A protein has these predicted regions:
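Active-site-proximal loop->helix
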Residues: 1-5
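Catalytic cores of soluble, metal-dependent hydrolases
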Residues: 8-10, 14-118
Length: 118
């Protein structure tokens, strides 16, 4: 379905390669990486990709997920190229840990996007 809609889905195990492709030396160096600089990019983070130790508030907890630092680095790397951002699959019936993490990722997106548009 995603391919039909011209959407690139990055599996959790491929996230580190995307960070490296986008930034090379770390978040913020501005290389276009896996997409063209003029592409319209929308970054959607599914909380299910995170390890449940950090984000228990999700409908599908799977062990061996991503570390929050990896997701933060990916958000920072994509933000300068993105037109929008969201965090999905947050369960509101947990202790608020996943929601707090989602809010912090949103903050990282806003700051990184703003720095790139100066």
């Amino acid at each position: 379905r995603a391919a039909d809609a011209d959407v690139e889905v990055v599996a959790p195990e491929d996230a580190r390669a995307w960070i490296d492709a986008l930034d090379g030396d770390g978040p913020g160096d501005g290389r276009a990486g896996p997409f063209d600089a003029d592409d319209s990019v929308y970054c959607s983070v599914d909380v299910d990709a995170l390890d449940p130790a950090y984000a228990p508030g999700t409908g599908t907890m799977e062990p061996f997920g991503l570390d929050p630092r990896e997701v933060r680095d990916l958000v920072r790397a994509v933000a300068p190229h993105a037109d929008g951002f969201d965090v999905v699959e947050v369960n509101d019936r947990d202790d608020g840990q996943a929601a707090a993490l989602g809010g912090k990722l949103l903050r990282e997106f806003v700051f990184s996007h703003a720095d790139a548009t100066r």
